[in-house]
Design a protein with these regions (language model features):
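Glycine-rich beta-strand-turn "strand-cap" elements at beta-sheet edges
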Residues: 1-3, 55-64, 90-134
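Short amphipathic alpha-helical segments
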Residues: 17-53, 86-90, 94
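An amphipathic, aromatic/His-enriched active-site/gating alpha helix that lines ligand/cofactor pockets
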Residues: 46-52, 71-105
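Short, well-ordered beta-strand segments in beta-rich or mixed alpha/beta enzyme
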Residues: 5-11, 21-22, 55-83
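Low-complexity, intrinsically disordered short peptide segments enriched in small/polar/basic residues
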Residues: 2-5, 15, 20, 104
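Generic alpha-helix initiation/capping and coil-helix boundary signal
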Residues: 2, 31-34, 74
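Non-catalytic surface loops within mature trypsin-like serine protease
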Residues: 13-15, 74, 106-109
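Intrinsically disordered, low-complexity terminal tails and inter-domain linkers enriched
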Residues: 15-32, 113, 117-128
Length: 134
């Protein structure tokens, strides 16, 4: 797979804490709005060079939790995509609502019909265990 990068953006619909005993889900209108915006964001990202695959999913056990997962040919391709006009218009406003956490992951192991494939990290030696600079 080479330099494939996995980007995971997680979202929580609705405001305030959810009572775990009564998870009824987000407001249907808010959910439709989120789905429409997420579909436009995914389409904009899919139109960029280096885009490999993308999916939007909802948590099976909590209808307020969503995930937009995309795969890119490289971290550079993903970062260039974020700079495109169409992505700035259609995706950036949605991505700004994502849970504030790291989103880009280098793929080091993958599984397929042929078994497990191992990839080396692109991080410099000694950097693999060092926290990111802030």
């Amino acid at each position: 797979m080479g330099d494939v990068v996995l980007v995971v953006n997680r979202f929580v619909l609705g405001a305030g804490p959810v009572d775990e005993r009564d998870v009824t889900g987000p407001d249907p209108d808010a959910e439709r709005d989120f789905l429409d915006r997420a579909e436009r964001a995914l389409a904009a990202l899919a139109g960029c060079a280096g885009f490999v695959h993308g999916e939007l999913g909802r948590a099976a056990d909590d209808p307020t939790r969503w995930c937009l997962a995309t795969r890119w040919a490289s971290i550079g391709a993903y970062r260039r995509a974020l700079g495109s006009y169409q992505v700035k218009v259609a995706a950036t406003p949605l991505l700004a609502e994502a849970v504030d956490e790291p989103t880009g992951y280098e793929v080091l192991r993958s599984a397929g019909a042929d078994g497990i494939t191992a990839e080396d990290s692109d991080r410099a030696p000694g950097e693999a265990n060092r926290p990111p600079r802030r």
